């Protein structure tokens, strides 16, 4: 479809969303609605792609250009200065095309997120096969409220579209509706647009009126009925956004299941459209896989896990974990209750256990951080073990510094690494050690001094407390026990003769 142009209408105010964010930039399944529309039409390979913006153009136009860059194609921006209706918006879009363009013009909207390339391709194929001047998508809805109704002759020919506000009672009973997706011959479109009028309930230039004008000129009008209404459903408010988001998620989840992924509870599992998952992976309830997350094969993910832009290697287990912009190596085990902040890279067969938080940290193959530890701005080698309750002290209030831990290192519980500091390969640290200076390879670092017990401190400093009473009772019990032990071990007195 190289000799074609696509015009995406994204100029509406979207007032029913009641949001400072433009309607077409609201997201579902990891993409804005505009991005969904642009991905669908980009699959057709059109020569020109025009996005018409109006209100909120300062947000919508840059977003459209960024999406185009991601898709690797040029996007032209057309501005609708005044909101004068869909017909006027398309006219603004045509102005962005070269004057000598003579191909097919596909018109769609930026708020139809489930519309796919296959449906658009079917529209184009029918348009070409029938040598039509205009071809439109229609669907049938149980509740057609808000949609334009399709008007047909007794023999089924499409003769026009009537908008809800202008429809009679009998016309409002029609359940076949306009999907607002069209393929026009550019000549027929230009001619019809030049004759649109505002004599309607909204006082606007309706693109839908172009259908009757083309037919009145003797042009060929064809329709493609879409049996799945969700594919062409639009979004006007947050209720519809949530409904379509749930429907899209259901389809995404089902596609992964058919590809060999076990999803235990689809109702509580949310997967963005750009996520990839390998075969024989099990996704447990309450899991969200978001953004560009890529999960390998034979993994176990969840329950109650959220991963955003995280790469998970084959055979890894990730349990009750929240992770963002991180990497988890093959065979690694993460969780439960682990927090992976951006920049975390866990090597193959590594472990990050309960209540471990990591940030901007590289953790080598086979290294374990089992529990209750913060690892920030650190590089840890292979097959090391970080004891419980250790803290990588990376921030002095002004500057963040890195800690480097070698391979085959064993650190005792409650070790503090005050960055910048380096611990050499094979070194050990004692429990409760504060590492302020580098530790040579193979050394044992101990910073705690000898333990000192201050006898009677509680009785003197906390008299009358429960602690003092318990200590006094223990002391008394100890004296009694000592006396009993002394009696048991005492030698009997020597016998005397009489």
From Swiss-Prot:
Assembly notes: Homotrimer.
Name of this protein: Bifunctional protein GlmU
UniProt keyword DNA-binding, yes or no: no
Pathway stated in the Swiss-Prot or TrEMBL entry: Nucleotide-sugar biosynthesis; UDP-N-acetyl-alpha-D-glucosamine biosynthesis; N-acetyl-alpha-D-glucosamine 1-phosphate from alpha-D-glucosamine 6-phosphate (route II): step 2/2; Nucleotide-sugar biosynthesis; UDP-N-acetyl-alpha-D-glucosamine biosynthesis; UDP-N-acetyl-alpha-D-glucosamine from N-acetyl-alpha-D-glucosamine 1-phosphate: step 1/1; Bacterial outer membrane biogenesis; LPS lipid A biosynthesis
Protein purpose: Catalyzes the last two sequential reactions in the de novo biosynthetic pathway for UDP-N-acetylglucosamine (UDP-GlcNAc). The C-terminal domain catalyzes the transfer of acetyl group from acetyl coenzyme A to glucosamine-1-phosphate (GlcN-1-P) to produce N-acetylglucosamine-1-phosphate (GlcNAc-1-P), which is converted into UDP-GlcNAc by the transfer of uridine 5-monophosphate (from uridine 5-triphosphate), a reaction catalyzed by the N-terminal domain.
EC number: 2.7.7.23, 2.3.1.157
Organism the protein comes from: Mycolicibacterium gilvum (strain PYR-GCK) (Mycobacterium gilvum (strain PYR-GCK))
Positions annotated to bind acetyl-CoA: 388, 394-395, 413, 431
Catalytic activity annotation: alpha-D-glucosamine 1-phosphate + acetyl-CoA = N-acetyl-alpha-D-glucosamine 1-phosphate + CoA + H(+); N-acetyl-alpha-D-glucosamine 1-phosphate + UTP + H(+) = UDP-N-acetyl-alpha-D-glucosamine + diphosphate
Binding-site residues for Mg(2+), renumbered to this chain: 111, 236
PANTHER family per record: BIFUNCTIONAL PROTEIN GLMU, NUCLEOTIDYL TRANSFERASE
Bound cofactor: record note: Binds 1 Mg(2+) ion per subunit.
Region (Pyrophosphorylase): 1-238
Places the protein is found: Cytoplasm
Lineage: superkingdom: Bacteria
Ranges where the record places region N-acetyltransferase: 260-498
Family membership noted in the UniProt record: In the N-terminal section; belongs to the N-acetylglucosamine-1-phosphate uridyltransferase family.
